[in-house]
Swiss-Prot record:
Occurrences of domain KRAB (ranges): 143-214
Keywords in alphabetical order: Activator, DNA-binding, Isopeptide bond, Metal-binding, Nucleus, Repeat, Transcription, Transcription regulation, Ubl conjugation, Zinc, Zinc-finger
Protein function: Functions as a transcriptional activator.
Organism in which the protein naturally occurs: Homo sapiens (Human)
Protein name: Zinc finger protein 398
Domain of life: Eukaryota
Coiled-coil positions: none
Segments forming C2H2-type zinc fingers: 343-364, 370-392, 398-420, 427-449, 455-477, 483-505, 511-533, 539-561, 567-590
Biased composition (Acidic residues): 207-220
Family: Belongs to the krueppel C2H2-type zinc-finger protein family.
PROSITE patterns reported for this sequence: KRAB, ZINC_FINGER_C2H2_1, ZINC_FINGER_C2H2_2
Length: 642
């Protein structure tokens, strides 16, 4: 029994040992291998798709760059077209203005021509016959009121008979009425005011064509009428003068009186009569007229005493019996002989053809060489400017209701009001929201966007976008300051600078801030102040990204990055970034000589080393020598530190 028991134990042990042996690993199935192959194929498909997409993106990028280039070219062409349209518009405006002026002058000439035709029909004016012009053109010879007037001295006037005095009065009155009939607002000549009887009006109604003859007192000899005088003048001249046949058409005779150009129709005359030294021969008039003019009238040609009409008797050359001379025509250039195609303007001396001379001389009709200093009007040399100045002195100067500025003329106030009223600025800038009152200001403003500076200073090379800026700059080179303050005597190179300076004396601050109670003298100061309320800082540093309110603050800040030191000390040679720092240095270190803080050798210090790239400049001006810091990047105007 004892031997039989161990046998089952050994069997159990062998079974346990066999159960404890490790099981064999399972072999991978074929399905897993197929899955791996499929995943690899899918990965290569995705890579190929990504590469195809990248190629498409690259193609689209190239097309986009090409389109951007074409867009830039189109924008340049569009800008060029806009510039051309603007230039054409300006030229068209100028042409329209010239056309309007020509139409006005044409209407004025038409009215004068109608008046002259009425004048000739009334026969109440002395008419000088002029030769026909080349190609039938109209000649012009200037003649004033005095050219057809005769003045007597006091002894000569007393020797005249009553009928001779009456004849003289009627002739002078006829000349004056002729000027009045041509719409000339002229004062009555002194000769008429003194010879006119008391109780008689200065001007009388003009006689009609039937009543145009000059009445004379009865005397032993028959009276002389205007028709008789015209009959003498209209007679044909002697053939020995060699004049060409007279033109049947009337010629225009251009004269001046009180600086107003006057067109008078006249009939043809021999060319020799235009010479200031050769008298004009006429056929002998009747005996009464012969005695009146040869014995009395032409005696005054040698008299130099004052006439009873307040005028000196001019020296006239002697004329033989039956001849009349017009010496005052000698002060004007005469038309050239027949055959010459060039004519000279007696106003400016230009040489023009005869058909162009008429149009050219119309431009002189509006010339007024004497401008009024207080208003845009111009006056002729004969006009009395003293009365106009007195009128300005008694007037209240026009004042702007918005800024209280005063102006010398209402038209300038009207133009100034456009500054306050933005709706009256019809010219907007296409590059910014600004608007302007006229095209010239818009053109000047657009040069700032285009960085165009066409006006260059010949002395220093600086360029300017405005011509007035160049002129003011050149006054600085010439030390010219023509505008002086009457209160403190300080001189300025421009009128606008003087006006801004005078606001200091008057306390005027026409630009108030709507957000606070502050007011400013200049508009740009108000704009800079408004940025404090809005938080706007439009000027950014390209190196560190710091933003500033004003442009000159940015320029000062950039000296830190560039190492620029534009303010050298004349004593020790040290240079400073800011002008205020140089002033502080001069006050502290130089009292008649170089201070202890300067280089004893008197040589300028070594140039600054490389800039510190990691310098923190947010809000503070850093002193690299450890002296102090100063907040100047904001609104303050103090200088920075070395």
């Amino acid at each position: 029994m004892a031997e039989a028991a161990p046998a089952p134990t050994s069997e159990w042990d062998s079974e346990c040992l066999t159960s404890l042996q490790p099981l064999p690993l399972p072999t991978p199935p074929a399905a897993n291998e197929a899955h791996l192959q499929t995943a690899a194929i899918s990965l290569w498909t995705v890579v190929a798709a990504v590469q195809a997409i990248e190629r498409k993106v690259e193609i689209h990028s190239r097309r986009l760059l090409h389109l951007e280039g074409r867009t830039g070219t189109a924008e340049k062409k569009l800008a060029s077209c806009e510039k051309t349209v603007t230039e054409l518009g300006n030229q068209l405006e100028g042409k329209w203005a010239v056309l309007g002026t020509l139409l006005q002058e044409y209407g004025l000439l038409q009215r004068r021509l109608e008046n002259l035709e009425n004048l000739l029909r009334n026969r109440n004016f002395w008419i000088l016959r002029l030769p026909p012009g080349i190609k039938g053109d109209i000649p012009k010879v200037p003649v004033a009121f005095d050219d057809v007037s005769i003045y007597f001295s006091t002894p000569e006037w007393e020797k005249l008979e009553e009928w001779q005095k009456e004849l003289y009065k009627n002739i002078m009155k006829g000349n004056y009425e002729s000027l009045i009939s041509m719409d000339y607002a002229i004062n009555q000549p002194d000769v008429l005011s003194q010879i006119q009887p008391e109780g008689e009006h200065n001007t009388e109604d003009q006689a009609g064509p039937e009543e145009s003859e000059i009445p004379t007192d009865p005397s032993e000899e028959p009276g002389i009428s205007t028709s008789d005088i015209l009959s003498w003048i209209k007679q044909e001249e002697e053939p020995q003068v060699g004049a060409p046949p007279e033109s049947k058409e009337s010629d225009v005779y251009k004269s001046t009186y009180a600086d107003e150009e006057l067109v008078i129709k006249a009939e043809g005359l021999a060319r020799s009569s235009l010479c200031p030294e050769v008298p004009v021969p006429f056929s002998s008039p009747p005996a009464a007229a012969k005695d009146a003019f040869s014995d009395v009238a032409f005696k005054s040609q040698q008299s130099t005493s004052m006439t009873p009409f307040g005028r000196p008797a001019t020296d006239l050359p002697e004329a033989s019996e039956g001849q009349v001379t017009f010496t005052q025509l000698g002060s004007y250039p005469l038309p050239p002989p027949v055959g010459e195609q060039v004519f000279s303007c007696h106003h400016c001396g230009k040489n023009l053809s005869q058909d162009m001379l008429l149009t050219h001389q119309c431009s002189h009709a509006t010339e007024h060489p004497l401008p009024c200093a207080q208003c845009p009007k111009h006056f002729t040399p004969q006009a009395d400017l003293s009365s106009t100045s007195q009128d300005h002195a008694s007037e209240t100067p026009p004042t702007c209701p918005h800024c209280a500025r005063t102006f010398t003329h209402p038209s300038r106030l009207t133009y100034h009001l456009r500054v306050h009223n933005s709706t009256e600025r019809p010219f907007p800038c296409p590059d910014c929201p600004k608007r302007f009152a006229d095209q010239a200001r818009l053109t000047s403003h657009r040069r700032a966007h285009a960085s165009e500076r066409p006006f260059r200073c010949a002395q220093c090379g600086r360029s300017f976008s405005l011509k007035i800026s160049l002129l003011l700059h050149q006054r600085g080179h010439a030390q010219e300051r023509p505008f002086s303050c009457p209160q403190c005597g300080i001189d300025f190179n421009g009128h606008s600078a003087l006006i801004r300076h005078q606001m200091i004396h008057t306390g005027e601050r026409p630009y108030p801030c709507t957000d606070c109670s502050k007011s400013f003298m200049r508009k740009e100061h108000l704009l800079n102040h408004r940025r404090l309320h809005t938080g706007e800082r439009p000027f950014s540093c390209p190196h560190c990204g710091k933003s500033f309110i004003r442009k000159h603050h940015l320029m000062k800040h950039q000296r830190i990055h560039t190492g620029e030191r534009p303010y050298p000390c004349s004593y020790c040679g040290r240079s400073f970034r800011y002008k205020q720092t140089l002033k502080d240095h001069l006050r502290s270190g130089h009292n008649g000589g170089c201070g202890g803080d300067s280089d004893p050798s008197g040589q300028p210090p070594n140039p600054p080393g490389p800039l510190i790239t990691g310098l923190e400049t947010s809000g503070l001006g850093v002193n690299t020598e450890g002296l102090e810091t100063n907040q100047w990047y904001g609104e303050g105007s103090g200088g920075g530190v070395l």
